[in-house]
Regions:
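Active-site beta-strand termini and strand-to-loop segments that position acidic
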Residues: 187-194
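A short, glycine/Asx- and small/polar-enriched loop/turn
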Residues: 180-184
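Beta-loop-alpha module in the N-terminal Rossmann-like domain of NAD(P)-dependent dehydrogenases
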Residues: 5-72
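A short helix-to-beta-strand connector/capping loop
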Residues: 1-6, 75-79
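Rossmann-like NAD(P)(H) cofactor-binding subdomain of soluble oxidoreductases
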Residues: 38, 58, 81-87
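Predominantly a Rossmann-like dinucleotide-binding segment in NAD(P)-dependent oxidoreductases
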Residues: 79, 86-178
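Hydrophobic residues in well-ordered beta-strands that form the structural core
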Residues: 55, 61, 80-82, 111
Length: 197
């Protein structure tokens, strides 16, 4: 195995160890792929230690925490990215090329769907640890489907078309009884060129 891998018992231990090393010998990036409510603390500690961060979306579960991270990144000038992984897929890049080349004409309407079957049942009661935190407002934030899945569609819309969203109306609803967060999310967007999505 040619790769030197160092294990740690906690991110605090990792950050303390990495912060002692010269820049060229540190880890390249800290990847934060924890449940949503556990993004802020390790991200902030990495930024403060000068360690670049690539964080799963959503950035945090509160606007205040997100604002704090943005301020820290700007102050410390540490590279920071938020994962919108579908943008790197070849189909996204091909779609972007086709749409932006003008081959299809002006963008007037964009339709996007992202269907996940696990939200149709109470997967959180069936032993799915991932489902448990994704539908818990304390751990997931203010939205399940919209915040977790809708963000992919909106980011893809901007990436492929090159257009910005001028106005957005969102409708979140919960079909599964007893669930605290949305399991259905619909948006209507007005785009910067007058098109709709």
């Amino acid at each position: 195995w040619p790769y030197p891998i160092q294990g740690y018992r906690s991110y605090d231990e990792m950050i303390a160890d990495q912060a002692k090393k010269p820049i060229g010998e540190r880890i390249d990036y800290a990847l934060i792929v924890t449940p949503n409510h556990v993004h802020f603390d390790p991200a902030m500690k990495c930024i403060q230690a000068g360690i670049p961060v690539f964080c799963e979306k959503p950035l945090t579960v509160t606007l205040d925490e997100s604002d704090q991270l943005v301020k820290a990144v700007r102050t410390k000038k540490v590279p920071f990215g938020v994962a919108h992984t579908y943008l790197g897929h070849w189909t996204s890049r091909l779609s972007r090329h086709i749409v932006r080349s003008g081959l299809l004409g002006e963008v007037r309407w964009v339709d996007s769907y992202y269907i996940q079957g696990w939200l149709a049942v109470r997967a959180e009661d069936m032993g799915s640890m991932q489902a448990e935190w994704r539908v818990d407002p304390k751990r997931a934030g203010g939205s399940c489907c919209g915040g977790d899945i809708g963000t992919h569609a909106l980011m893809q819309l901007r990436f492929v078309t090159g257009l910005e969203i001028k106005r957005l109306q969102a409708h979140m609803e919960t079909f599964v009884k007893g669930r605290q967060l949305d399991d259905h999310f619909t948006t209507y967007c007005e785009l910067s060129n007058g098109g709709k999505a």
